[in-house]
Amino acid sequence: MCGITGAVGRNSKHAISPELLTRMTDAISHRGPDDSQTWIGTDHKDAYGHDLCVALGFRRLSIIDLEGARQPMANEDGTIRMVFNGEIYNYGTLRRRLEGKGHQFATHGDGESILHLYEDYGTDCFEHLNGMFAIGIWDSNRNRFVLARDRIGQKPLYYAVKDHRLIFGSELKSLAKVQDICTEIDPAAIDEFLTYQYVPHPGTIWKGVRKLAPGHFAVFENGNISVQRYWDFDPSIERPIQANQATETLRELLTDSVKLRMQSDVPLGSFLSGGIDSSLITAIASGQSSSPVRSFSIGFPVADFDETAYAAQVAKHLGTQHQRFEVMPSGVDVIDQLVWH
């Protein structure tokens, strides 16, 4: 995973300094140990003539195009800049389409396709993306900042708006570095957490911070933010199908889904519990891989709670390079670190 953060606001006492942006970016260093980059632009104005400061920070975990694809990245003429956390599975198809329309790519990464897609489609571009993502785009042509989150919200994205300024980040840790962000605990959020074991969007544990909902994008311009849905789940089916058709369709969809997620310039692995879900995914991945898949399972020293024997059976059947890890009672010593991350 990677991490993104940043801010947009009037270039006054509320501007983000390079030092503050670095602290916001370093707060999520665990999300991206491979690279850290920041960018600040101050030669922008809003519709009322106010000077704007745009700050972007990025922590990278390299998966595709290890040497290139550094962020924040810009389009050909530097009028659009972006930070992006996630992976776009259909980037190959998108790239070929965009190159056919004359776009020039500077990297081989999946994220650059978002930039050029946005140039052509604006906020409608998110409908074309197949993947998991949290995106921040500065559009200097329109003097606006756009946030977007993938369809089911696999990648997190938090934001706050105060004093005509937008602050955003992959985690609350980045926003907490900004002193005037309201971090007062929301009692309603505590009630929701105790009821559901999580805080439903758009709320968070803090009164002054919101989560961008899955399948939504937000546009921040002239000190105001508007949120819109770009995708929703359609539970209907076009026509009734037979059980054997449903079985084959599920097989095709699952195989295609796993295949898309195996695009990588680094070694891949599979978390294998021995249950139906992880066993199916590992089996499909093994069928798509030219070399044995690496699989991992987590066990416990108490037999009643340990299911790694099932994982070992599946691993042996599939011929994976399997490794078992055991959680010991001493693991409680790192509980604070686990909660923090």
Model-identified regions with their sequence ranges:
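ATP-dependent adenylate-handling active sites, centered on carboxylate activation for C-N bond formation
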Residues: 1, 7-20, 40-48, 100, ...
